[in-house]
Amino acid sequence: MALPDFSMRQLLEAGCHFGHQTHRWNPKMKDFIFGERSNIHIIDLSQTVPLLHQALVKVRETAAKGGRVLFVGTKRQAQDPLAQAAGRCAQYYMNQRWLGGTLTNWRTISNSIARLRELEGMFENEGGMAGLTKKEQLMLTREREKLDRSLGGIKDMGGTPDLMFVIDTNKEGIAIQEAKKLGIPVIAVVDTNCDPDLVDFPIPGNDDASRAISLYCDLIADAVLDGMGDSQLAMGMDLGEAEAPVETLVEAEAEVVAEAAPAAEEAPAAEAEAAATDTSSESDKTEA
């Protein structure tokens, strides 16, 4: 199976080339900057394309070996596309506040996940709440909701991930530090105010615009699905004869590709530029 296809035109239309104001740049991003316009740095997408391709290759290789991929992005505009992409490719995500020790103190996190499962079982079992007062039930409901917000995306991970994909390295600095401490490779979108040396596979690009974030997440998810397909083929399995979960993944990939193609052609570049410019003007793409 082939890697997900993408073009520089798609990156342009999504506004991936818009950086931050020139005075807020990180000098380490100098080699990835094409120039500036209206005091906004413009990212060199001719470098983004090959680096994004390298990242997708790494994702596919990891998925083909049965590895776990963790999507991380807690800023508001990344939360929904991140969760949707991770769910579509049967991987894991954290889109709320990163809990310190999520990776380096996995045993404690596992205990919290066990508690979440216990609460879910109580609510699913008709007699699980028997004998509890309304106040006690309300407290348990709130506890379950809080745990689900924080850990729902990783409750089925079963251990630390083999690869981590990050949106906004500045905001997710703790997550990156934990991954590096454990030797977990990190793929990340690096904007003009980021340090590309902190990650193993930097992808120069806008990490604030919603359309850009959705594009990155979808490409990573498609690469995971490709890797899963390669794994099935390597085992000599006919995908047409595979079990329902694999069929669901392949069908989901086909649907997303079919929907994304016409959308990319119809979306005017001017709209993407305006959206990205608006994002930059809001306190210069304030880091959430």
From Swiss-Prot:
Naturally occurring in which organism (per UniProt)? Maricaulis maris (strain MCS10)
Q: Which cysteines are joined by disulfide bonds?
A: none
Output the InterPro entries linked to this UniProt entry: Ribosomal_uS2, Ribosomal_uS2_bac/mit/plastid, Ribosomal_uS2_CS, Ribosomal_uS2_flav_dom_sf
Highest taxon, organism lineage: Bacteria
Q: Which UniProt keywords apply?
A: Ribonucleoprotein, Ribosomal protein
GO molecular function terms listed in the Swiss-Prot or TrEMBL record: structural constituent of ribosome
The record's family statement is: Belongs to the universal ribosomal protein uS2 family.
**What name does the UniProt record give this protein?**
Small ribosomal subunit protein uS2
Cellular component GO terms held in the UniProt record: cytosolic small ribosomal subunit
